[in-house]
A protein has these predicted regions:
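Basic, nucleic-acid-binding surfaces and adjacent catalytic neighborhoods in DNA/RNA-processing proteins
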Residues: 22-36, 48, 144-277
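Gly/Gly-Pro- and Ser/Thr-rich, intrinsically disordered tail segments characteristic of DNA damage-repair
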Residues: 1-110
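Phosphate/anion-contacting hairpin/loop surfaces
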Residues: 64-174, 182, 189, 194
Length: 277
């Protein structure tokens, strides 16, 4: 499932392609069609991300809530580009682009100003990517859930909004915190490291299109890996811990371990993440 940085990037791309200009809107999913008449001759005012959801606001006060879940995707195509062979939910045509929502099943029509009443949005915690949310805010928020396992809490959008499986694994490795510890057992220093890593890695993932490691380190790893196997993709070098079971930790060379926690794969370094506070 796309995480906060991916939805943030998608919302920015869609906004740049369609906002504040004439559009032709085609609604293809039955749940979307009731607004077809009301959305004639309108423009898109703005497109914003809310955790893993997107809000597309139209000039008549109607707002489209959409959540990609596992298979949905917003794609910006050029005007003459062939569409993907996937289920099309809606198309926003402009003079230069076709913006398509593919395969999503979770959407709703809302009104501007009432978005926070939507059940998903109403339960969101502080947005990690929000520039107004500081590391201190994150520390205070996490401290409200002392009995929660830190790895579980970071996936709970009610606790913090925008983190998913790859970010929680990498955040906890960078912070040198054992993912199975309860929040109440962590020191103030550990909580601050987690909070700072939440901000840093989320922002870096936006800036680097999903790469959580520093760019120079990532590129150096890619070059080294390519010498051993030319078929290795960027996936093998982009993360600190996520999806690297058995691969050496970038810092200490201990093999990364995978366990199942809450039905999800959880990756960590048993050496670095058992270090003292």
């Amino acid at each position: 499932m796309p995480e906060g940085p991916e939805i943030f990037l998608a919302s920015r791309a869609v906004h740049a392609a369609v906002a504040q200009q004439p559009i032709e809107l085609t609604l293809l999913h039955p749940a979307l069609k009731p607004q077809a008449r009301a959305l004639r001759d309108v423009q898109v005012s703005r497109v914003v991300a809310r955790s893993k959801a997107m809000l597309t606001e139209f000039s008549n006060g109607v707002v489209l809530y959409s959540h990609n879940q596992l298979y949905g995707e917003w794609v910006v195509h050029s005007k003459d580009e062939a569409l993907l062979k996937r289920q099309v939910r809606l198309v926003i045509n402009t003079a230069q682009h076709q913006v398509v929502l593919y395969s999503a099943t979770d959407f709703a029509w809302l009104q501007t100003g009432a978005e926070h009443a939507h059940p998903y949005i109403a339960k969101l915690g502080p947005e990690v990517l929000d520039t107004a949310v500081s590391a201190a805010h994150i520390v205070n928020r996490l401290a409200q859930f002392p009995r929660r396992v830190i790895a579980d809490a970071l996936l709970d959008q009610h606790v913090l909004a925008g983190l998913g499986n790859y970010l929680r694994a990498d955040v906890l490795l960078v912070a040198r915190v054992n993912p199975l510890c309860k929040i109440g057992s962590l020191t103030a220093a550990q909580l601050l490291r987690v909070a700072k890593a939440c901000k840093q890695l989320s922002q870096r993932s936006v800036q680097q299109a999903g790469v959580t490691r520093p760019w120079a380190q990532y590129m150096a790893s890619k070059v080294t890996m390519a010498k051993a196997d030319a078929n290795l993709s960027y996936e093998a070098a982009r993360f600190y811990a996520f999806d690297r079971e058995g691969a050496p930790c970038w810092d200490c060379a201990t093999p990364i371990v995978r366990v199942t926690q809450g039905g999800r794969g959880l990756f960590f370094c048993p050496t670095c993440q058992n270090a003292p506070a």
